[in-house]
Design a protein with these regions (language model features):
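Conserved Helicase C-terminal RecA-like lobe
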Residues: 52-63, 107-228
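Short, surface-exposed basic-aromatic patches at helix termini and helix-loop junctions that form
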Residues: 14-15, 193-198, 249
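A short acidic (Asp/Glu
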Residues: 6-7, 186-191, 245-246
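Conserved two-lobed SF2 helicase motor
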Residues: 222-240
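Inter-lobe coupling linker of SF2 helicases/translocases
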Residues: 1-124
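A short beta-strand-to-loop transition that corresponds to the Sensor-1 phosphate-sensing loop
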Residues: 1, 106, 179-182, 234-237, ...
Length: 252
């Protein structure tokens, strides 16, 4: 794995043969054809072994709670001006951003609202632009969605505890939970720790805000038998290029 840059790939080839590439910025496939083989997963699946097992996908659905329905109705009815000097299309764009955050978690949507309100209040008063009141109304509705009202979270909690899912929280059955939003990650980290009565070191989180050293330590711990970690909650930083499969076969 590498970042796609010619120089990065050249550095890997030079580990195998320091004389293969004279100029990391200027080389051809003929320079390296003797030291690497390119294969895709589809090519390897036909080799006659069972190294690549078929993945099983299940789509889980949950019915929205009353407070979630109320918040979504407020969101749908919301009309954003965005900025006195900007176009309405930008208001629609930000509303799409809010919608994605809302479907991630109330916490993620509230964070997006707070960031927008901070920018607006640096330029306007509440009377200058109606967006401030509109966003405050939506924020108030979202604050009423408690963890108990957060239907997706409650469904996740039920799944992890269910006999059908059969998760025993053993060292060889660890779980990776992905989320795009940092606030959702933080919410899950704190709430799952409480609701599953997990110790602090049994649940970890990882995001792009962390240093490479800290990220690598978490990945290494996740793959060790003796490590107490059972759940890893991660942002997109862990979606590619990390080996998390040694002690885990479940992704959420």
């Amino acid at each position: 794995p590498h970042d796609g840059r010619r120089e990065s790939f050249a550095s890997l080839m030079n580990i195998l043969d320091p004389t293969a590439i004279a100029n990391p910025k200027d080389y051809t496939k003929d320079d390296i054809k003797g030291i690497f083989i390119r294969r895709f997963k589809k090519d390897l699946k036909n080799l006659g072994d069972s190294s690549f097992l078929e993945r099983k996908f299940e789509c889980e659905r949950s019915k929205a709670s009353k407070n979630e329905e109320i918040a979504f109705d407020v969101f749908v009815d919301m009309k954003l001006q965005m900025d006195i000097n900007k176009t309405r299309n930008q208001g629609r764009l930000f509303k799409t951003h809010l919608e994605k955050a809302l479907f991630s978690s109330p916490a993620a949507c509230i964070k997006s609202i707070e960031n927008r309100l901070k920018k607006l209040r640096n330029k306007y008063t509440d009377d200058d632009i109606k967006d401030i009141n509109e966003l405050e109304t939506l924020k108030d509705a979202l604050l009423k969605i408690t963890p108990h009202d957060f239907s997706k979270y409650q469904h996740l909690l039920h799944l992890l505890k269910s006999s059908e899912y059969n998760w025993k929280a053993q060292s060889d059955d660890r779980i990776v939970i992905f989320t795009e939003r940092i606030e959702t990650m933080n919410f899950l980290y704190e709430q799952l720790k409480k609701d599953l009565t997990l110790k602090n070191d049994a649940i970890q989180k990882m995001s792009g805000d962390m240093s490479d050293i800290d990220q690598q330590k978490i990945v290494e711990d996740f793959g060790r038998d003796e490590s107490p970690v059972r759940i890893l909650i991660a942002s997109d930083v862990a979606s590619e290029g990390l080996n998390l499969h040694y002690k885990s076969h479940r992704l959420i």
